[in-house]
């Protein structure tokens, strides 16, 4: 505690008292405000904590250059480790401690694959955060900065890491099932106007994506236009047919190993840091 007073100190919130004076709060009621404490940056989730984490991430980017890959890893409540340990008539949302523990172990394994087994190449630096969705499922946002020789610089490099097409069910049946279950966006649009992504009649995630015969880097920055061939291959999702223009970018190895929603994107700017 003695060595971390800058992070742990509290101070009187005089600004609040000044605000009350401006708002003409009666003097006899102002004393009830008493002393206010500013939560320290060590208190996770507070504005000071989020600002500090953002500044730390930007410091890493300044030293090691912009991120190369942005990965979103979401917990799958149907993982056997969760389902097999649920008591009778209990669902995963009733056991957040079980879900969180399993997800944390999977996340540690994923980070070992990335940083020790070098599935994307050798990593120069990385940063990640873990968040909880409204329905209680944890997910992690991971930024990777690769060593220079492993950075995806041309379309062929991107195609080796990322797919945005429905696999062939005859030759890659297991991968096909995982993609259809976890990596299809929708149904949305006219197929499902009440989808959560729909605002003013338009998908906020910009689906459907345009078909492309080859991957192209965009001069304006952001994510590349991935290869999405219009080969007619379809997947049935909630009784609706979806095509390659509705596939969320993924890495086949990670999907086969972790059987979860794992969105893998190539970064072109530092804007992805704001998602942390």
Feature-to-residue mapping (PLM):
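Extended, structured polyanion-binding interfaces
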Residues: 1-275
């Amino acid at each position: 505690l003695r060595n971390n007073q800058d992070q742990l100190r509290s101070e009187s919130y005089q600004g609040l008292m000044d605000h009350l004076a401006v708002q003409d709060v009666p003097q006899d009621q102002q004393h009830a405000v008493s002393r206010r404490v500013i939560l320290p940056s060590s208190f996770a989730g507070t504005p000071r904590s989020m600002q500090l984490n953002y500044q730390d991430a930007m410091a890493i980017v300044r030293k090691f250059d912009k991120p190369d890959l942005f990965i979103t890893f979401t917990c799958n409540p149907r993982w056997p480790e969760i389902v097999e340990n649920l008591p009778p008539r209990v669902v995963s949302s009733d056991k957040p401690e079980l879900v969180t523990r399993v997800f944390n172990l999977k996340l540690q394994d994923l980070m070992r694959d990335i940083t020790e087994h070098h599935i994307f190449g050798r990593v120069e630096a990385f940063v990640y955060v873990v968040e909880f969705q409204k329905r209680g499922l944890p997910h992690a946002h991971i930024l990777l900065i690769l060593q220079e020789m492993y950075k995806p610089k041309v379309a062929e490099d991107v195609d080796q890491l990322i797919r945005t097409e429905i696999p062939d069910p005859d030759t890659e049946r297991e991968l096909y099932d995982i993609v259809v279950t976890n990596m299809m966006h929708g149904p949305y649009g006219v197929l499902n106007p009440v989808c959560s992504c729909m605002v003013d009649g338009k998908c906020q995630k910009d689906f459907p994506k345009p078909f492309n015969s080859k991957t192209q880097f965009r001069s304006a920055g952001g994510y590349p236009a991935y290869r999405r061939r219009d080969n007619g291959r379809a997947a049935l999702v909630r009784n609706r047919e979806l095509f390659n223009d509705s596939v969320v970018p993924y890495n086949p190895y990670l999907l086969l190993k972790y059987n979860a929603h794992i969105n893998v994107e190539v970064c072109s700017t530092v804007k992805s840091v704001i998602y942390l």
